[in-house]
Amino acid sequence: STGILAGGYRALYELTDVEKDEAGIQVLGDINVTADNTVPQDNSNINPEDYVNTGIEFIDVLPIDGYVSEKDQSDIELAASANFDWSLPSDFMRTTKDFWETSSHHITVGGTITPTGKILRVGIIEPSGIRRCIYATGNFSYNFPLDKTGFYCVYAINDNSEVVNLTGHYGTY
C-alpha cells in the first residue's frame, strides 16, 4: 500500500506545473496551492467577479461575435510603450496598434477603470491571435510574460451594459 501511495504522489507531482509568483507559489491549471481550489486555464466557465484584480491570467476564449472591435487610431505605431484613454461602449473591444516584441520579454499593462466597480477584460493578443487576459476594476497593473516573438497588441473588452472608461499605459521590457 505504501508503494501505491508513493506512486500517486509521484503522478500528482508530475502533473503539477508550478510557477513562482510575487504573491507566493501558484499552480496554473491545476490546484492553487495557496487557496486550495481549482484555477481554470481559460475563462469559459468562470464568474469574473471571483477573479477581479487577483493577478490570475486566463486564455480568453469567450466569443466576441457581435462585439464592435476597433483599433486605436492614435499616431503611435509600433511603440514599445504608450498611454491610452479609452471610452468603451457595451459589447465593445478596443486594441492598440500592433507592435513587435521578442520572446522572453514582458508587456506590463496598468490603468484605472471607471465607473467604480465595473469589470473589464484587459490583456494582450499574441502573434498567433490567442488572447490572454485578466479581469480588472479600479486601479490595476499586470505583467504578461512572453514566449513568442512577433506582433502583439493590448486590448480591453467591455462586457458591461454601460460605457466603461479605461485610462492606462502599457510598456515592454
What are the language-model segments listed below?
Residues H105-I107, P145-N160:
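Noncatalytic modules at the cell exterior or secretory-pathway interfaces
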Residues L88-S103:
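Non-catalytic, beta-strand-enriched accessory regions in extracellular/secretory proteins
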Residues G138-F144:
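Short strand-edge motifs at loop-to-beta-strand transitions and within beta-strands
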Residues L120, N160-Y173:
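Edge beta-strands of jelly-roll/beta-sandwich modules across compartments, strongly enriched
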